[in-house]
């Protein structure tokens, strides 16, 4: 009977052990994310829904969300992004690609994108918009516990 109770308890706990964190983030024409801090648990799948709630087109006021590995120098990474227009302002060199945990598409006003990723290690994961000049204002931190 004890074994059956343990199995039943494990089955009840299983769905919460692997719960999916859902995050809704927006960016606007004033170069602002609606959240500067986000939280998740290590090993937990994150579904990020990102919407550009402004009206300006992608060529004038494009926004994305790029999550970087803990310890990444945001200014150095953003400097490489500025010259990567043909790739949605995401650098293509191996060193930079290794710093990226997850990234949405570059969006214009009214557009949205959804990504899924799973941070496996605890830490402070910076996130930024890589459109030229935006990272100085459009950045935050995903704290993974």
Predicted segments, located by residue:
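Positively charged n-region of N-terminal signal peptides that target proteins for export
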Residues: 1-4
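Short, solvent-exposed loop/turn elements at domain surfaces
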Residues: 31-34, 56-60, 74-76
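Beta-strand signatures of extracellular beta-sandwich domains
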Residues: 64-68
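Extracellular/periplasmic metallocenter environments
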Residues: 102-145
């Amino acid at each position: 009977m004890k074994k059956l109770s343990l199995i039943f308890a494990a089955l009840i706990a299983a769905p919460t052990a692997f719960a999916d964190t859902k995050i809704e983030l927006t960016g606007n024409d004033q170069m602002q994310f609606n959240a500067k801090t986000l939280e998740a648990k290590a090993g937990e799948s994150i579904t990020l829904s990102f919407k550009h709630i402004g009206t300006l087109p992608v060529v004038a006021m494009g926004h994305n969300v790029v999550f970087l590995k803990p310890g990444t120098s945001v200014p150095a990474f953003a400097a490489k992004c500025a010259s990567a227009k043909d790739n949605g302002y995401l650098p293509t060199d191996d060193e930079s690609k290794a710093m990226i945990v997850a990234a949405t598409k570059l969006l214009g006003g009214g557009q949205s994108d959804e990504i899924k990723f799973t941070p496996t290690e605890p830490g402070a994961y910076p996130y930024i918009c890589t459109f030229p000049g935006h990272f100085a204002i459009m950045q935050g931190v995903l704290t993974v516990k």
